[in-house]
Amino acid sequence: MTHNSSNKKTIHIVVAALSIAAIATALLVYRSYFITGYDGNEAKWIYIGDKMTSDSIGQILGSELGATGKKAATIWSLAGGDASRAHGAYRIEPGMSAAKIYRKISRGAQTPVKLTFNNVRTVNQLAGLVGRRLETDSAAFLSACDSILPEKGFKKQQYAAAFLPDSYEFYWTASPEKVVTTLCGYRDRFWNDERRAKASGLGLSPVQVAIIASIAEEETNDRAERGTVGRLYLNRVKKGMKLQADPTVKFAVGDFSLRRITGKHLAIQSPYNTYQNAGLPPGPIRIADRETINAILDSKPHPYLYMCAKEDFSGRHNFAVTYAEHQQNAARYHRALNSRNIK
């Protein structure tokens, strides 16, 4: 009897010990896979292409996210992760557990990617930015522009008027058509009835406002001056005068770094050369921002017909009503150019 009791006691102890060991192991596994997180100092982006296999996804997780990534890869493998659902971009935050990483990727719960452009001149440059930030490439974006924008009333030279600089969010996998349509949709909402009425009051279409705004942005570094500059161009158009805007010449030449416009530049044959052609150029010379467009729409009437960069190289301008006054301003500016040996 005593011997049997001793055996039972031993069995109970062994069972208890094994149970404790099992619980401890389970807790360690749980902690390792469900609590202990990615130990990177900053967030990490994981990009999974549509042609990637389950094996290659596991390899990426392991190589990019260290020990936590290897555990996520183990879960992925054991659970038979579906590669077709994982296509996308995922932002992995510090502290994110292996289990959470697995769930995020296996469900295709992508993290939106920010597409920000504030100083993009051309649609080609915008296409390059889209190609760097999203899965699609620049050529596909431009092709989507050609397919979509003419149907919305934009001529090829007017494509820059279809977009507004800002920060936008897209899934990395967004199609180029989705990107173009979304960006253009923001522009359409910006041009509400109130703004369209203001443009009409100036005798302009929204595209023409964007053209004037684009030249004003290139003409002056001072945002407070852009409405005045835009109204000056409008004054000249209404009087049948050529704009004679230097930024349009730089655009025609293809060199915005020019510091001094000379006779050879003015002689360039281009529909964008407003020294050669009357009226507005056929399209914007850059993607104009909302603030400048609003400045044009809200600009106060004034009599100025001429402007010249200030001789202090501040990026601001001296404005003039008469050509004689303008010549005096121009003479001061050219003396300043010569004194700095700017050719």
What residue spans do the PLM features occupy?
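Conserved SxxK-family serine transpeptidase/carboxypeptidase catalytic domain
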Residues: Q244-R286
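Conserved catalytic or metal-liganding residues and their short signature motifs at active sites
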Residues: M1-Q244, V249-G254, R286-E291, A295-P303, ...
